[in-house]
Amino acid sequence: MRTCYTGQVCRDHLGQTVTLYGWVNRRRDHGGVIFIDLRDRTGLAQIVFDPDNAGAFGTAERLRNEFCVRVTGLVRERPQGTTNAELASGEVEVLCRDVEILNPSVTPPFQLDDDNLSETTRLTHRVLDLRRPQMQRNLMLRYRVSIEVRKFLDQLGFIDIETPMLTKSTPEGARDYLVPSRVNAGHFFALPQSPQLFKQMLMVSGFDRYYQITKCFRDEDLRADRQPEFTQIDCETSFLTETEIRAVFESMIRHVFKVVQNVDLPDPFPIMTWTEAMARFGSDKPDMRVNLEFTDVADIMRDVDFKVFASAATTQGSRVVALRVPGGGELSRSEIDAYTQFVGIYGAKGLAYIKVNDVAKGREGLQSPIVKNLHDAALAELVKRTGAQDGDIIFFGADRAKVVNDALGALRVKIGHSEFGKKTGLFSGGWRPLWVVDFPMFEYDEEEGRYTAAHHPFTSPKDGHEDFLETDPSQAFAKAYDMVLNGWEIGGGSVRIHREEVQSKVFRALKIGPDEAREKFGFLLDALQYGAPPHGGIAFGLDRIVTMMTGADSIRDVIAFPKTQRAQDLLTQAPSSVDDKQLRELHIRLRNTEVK
């Protein structure tokens, strides 16, 4: 029986006989004495094989990397000069008395300490990839986060309740993953994008504090921070105000970071409205470590000769902003060209700029191809409003508001995170949480000619905004809130609609007629008529939080068995084709039988 884990062997075990299990990380033959580094999920221990023990030594000669073994031996101090300060077990070694090969290994396709492996190789051989110490640390940290979340919520009286994985497809949000029903021909379940409606049903049922750590599914195009199946810390409460809900879950995140990372997050978190965040940073999830922000200059540019600025300044739905970069005058032409190309990704047609060489000289102290198209009053007000000083550069965005927000918002972050930004103090580092609140309830879809829900259609309007649902949905703001950390949305929630008549108004604003609403959401509308309590909640992305804590490059590095950006599992080769018999049982016929 194992006496302790390999990485836990230390001076406390001196003189003791221990039994260890693990894998051969490395084998070394030093002049008749054989050493192996034995590895398990806790770390490494050095095992010594003396030729005087012929049986153990003979077995050691056959050991190779990744053999699974059991070792029994005496813990002793390492000889002077051979200690390894990088290992917890680095002051001791185990003199092997007995070793058993539990299972040999074929030659692995890569060395576990190879840091230059392609993601395809790593995901195809995920079993071996997960043996790598960094991956094991990532998953152990993920486990610790989950445990601390559960501890915190349990102490506050939250109940862990499971909700269905086979549910009903709804029209809002991303595409559903559909599951055909064998016993109900022509009908389909959907895998849940979130437990949203079920947790609201639980509130109506009287379970006033609910949570679960659960899988959710969205059939959408993937990025580094997205997976088709992801894990959500899902929570809902009754009888709490928006402020009280935020306070509970802010405390939870503060607790988790303190216990798991020994990080003290601010108390309380700053709060910013969506309107302010978009105006200052062009983003509803601003990275507050970057010490740059927008200055609106549309009013200055209405009557200038530069058509790009003047047109945007006088067109509804457009904006003209300036982004002053202190010390940015030192940026080279090639660096500015690279930034110009970068903002093009977000739809910007160019990147105008002005270098401020000498404020005292007025126009003559400004360097830019566009200066000649701006009159003296505009230039003077621009310098004054942005607070520009000698040696600065001012970048401009002038276009539809979405293009400006996306392009200049991304540029702000890119400059802040650059070597230049870090060198000049534009990036402060650390952990900078933020609540963004008061989101618009709706977004207008130009293609469909109707409003869509900005979050989801069950979010309550702010007090006094209910009438806008019928008169002007664009003016309706929601009791919605996102928790943002270092430029990432790690959690989002809202106060929910708990009155049937308000929910029906929202459906009408979304052009969901009574028949469609009854067909798709009849169970919700009915439930709201039975004394549904005021309620609200939040959901956190566990994968994203752990990615940030570990500093991993991709969310796939904190998930045991993730999918690729093509939503494929390279380990099991899923998704795969199925045979005709299975399709017939599901009442499905493929229109194109040629499977790629």
Curated annotation (Swiss-Prot):
Any one of the GO CC terms: cytoplasm
One GO biological process term: aspartyl-tRNA aminoacylation
Compartments, record wording: Cytoplasm
Top-rank taxon, per record: Bacteria
Transmembrane segments: none
Record's keyword terms, sorted: Aminoacyl-tRNA synthetase, ATP-binding, Cytoplasm, Ligase, Nucleotide-binding, Protein biosynthesis
Oligomer and partners: Homodimer.
Protein name: Aspartate--tRNA(Asp/Asn) ligase
Organism field: Bordetella avium (strain 197N)
